[in-house]
A protein has these predicted regions:
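Compositionally biased, proline/threonine/alanine/serine-rich low-complexity intrinsically disordered stretches
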Residues: 2-49
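Stable alpha-helical elements in mature extracytoplasmic
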Residues: 4-7, 11, 87-94, 168, ...
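Short acidic, Pro/Gly- and aromatic-enriched capping/linker segments at domain boundaries
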Residues: 47-61
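Extracellular/periplasmic catalytic domains that process cell-envelope and extracellular macromolecules
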Residues: 62-63, 107-109, 220-224
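Acidic/histidine-rich, surface-exposed loop or edge segments in extracytoplasmic proteins
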Residues: 62-85
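Short, solvent-exposed loop/turn segments at secondary-structure junctions
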Residues: 76-77, 120-123, 234-236
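Acidic/His-rich structured neighborhood in mature extracellular/periplasmic domains
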Residues: 85-197, 201
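Metalloprotease/metallohydrolase-associated module, dominated by Zn2+-dependent proteases
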Residues: 140-148, 162, 196-268
Length: 268
């Protein structure tokens, strides 16, 4: 999923959505599998501007596996508490895996990045959720500005759904990678941009296998931000596009592999 913001509206002008934009049998990665880039392309957030529902609430701040998580009170009390407890347990599962995989110094930085989880946001339909890099995109649409600089899980129950786990078991890692890119490395980090440009010139992401066995354009080809987040999934865990895992990444895109090894640390 892409960070939602102005830069992605610009990116969509050049490339509308991801590989499935070219696939005659669309199966979006992160929009219910939906991608947040798709949410900007189709812009469900702005399609009904006059009908935006206010979804502001005071979250309950929880520490989950060392991360600060802003929790919708509906997930903790009342009729949705059981489902909420299961969703928060699954979020903890995602975060536990990240905590195991990252070296201590990188983990310390990663845990500074915050998460916001809604029972069900009425307008932002990207699932399980995007990363919001800035306030402007949010305030222009009447959304809570406190979502800025946070990974936003827009519908808690999406974390429990089988199709999401099959497609992208590292979705929280993907979104936290966006946050890390933005807040720790900087979206203008030159090494990532250079690696992305080299890969695009070589065309190595133009046609790859996805988790369904279909040949598609890799979501990493969208822009350098998705290139980094998608590569992070493969390097640290498993992605839903080839290269799926680290050994394949090392063979397919050694420049990105070595860069990620420097950023995240060696895996031995």
């Amino acid at each position: 999923m892409a960070p939602i913001g102005k830069s992605f509206a610009e990116a969509v002008a050049k490339f509308q959505k991801r590989p499935e934009a070219e696939d005659k049998n669309p199966d979006p990665k992160r929009n219910g599998g939906k991608s947040s880039l798709e949410s900007v392309a189709k812009d469900p957030a702005t399609a009904q501007e006059t009908g935006v529902k206010k979804a502001h609430f005071d979250p309950v701040i929880k520490d989950i596996e060392g991360w600060t998580v802003h929790v919708d009170p509906k997930l903790l009390q009342g009729e949705h508490a059981v489902e909420g407890g299961r969703a928060l347990k699954m979020l903890a599962n995602h975060l536990q895996r990240i905590a195991i995989l990252l070296p201590k110094d990188r983990l310390e930085k990663m845990r500074r990045l915050e998460i916001w989880i809604d029972y069900a946001h009425p307008n932002i339909k990207v699932e399980p959720g995007p990363y919001h890099p800035g306030v402007k995109w949010l305030t222009e649409r009447g959304y809570d500005p406190r979502l800025a600089k946070k990974v936003h899980i827009t519908r808690a129950a999406s974390l429990l759904e089988r199709h999401h786990m099959i497609k992208h078991p590292a979705v929280i890692l993907h979104e936290l990678a966006h946050a890390y890119h933005d807040q720790v490395l900087g979206f203008d980090e030159p090494r990532i941009k250079a690696a992305y440009e080299k890969a695009m010139k070589a065309g190595i992401y133009d046609e790859v296998l996805d988790y369904r066995g279909k040949k598609v354009r890799h979501y990493a080809a969208t822009n350098h931000m998705e290139y980094f987040a998608e590569g992070t999934e493969a390097y640290l865990y498993r992605n839903d596009f080839y290269p799926f895992v680290r050994a394949e990444l090392k063979n397919h895109d050694p420049v990105l592999h070595d860069l990620l090894e420097d950023i995240w640390g060696p895996l031995e």
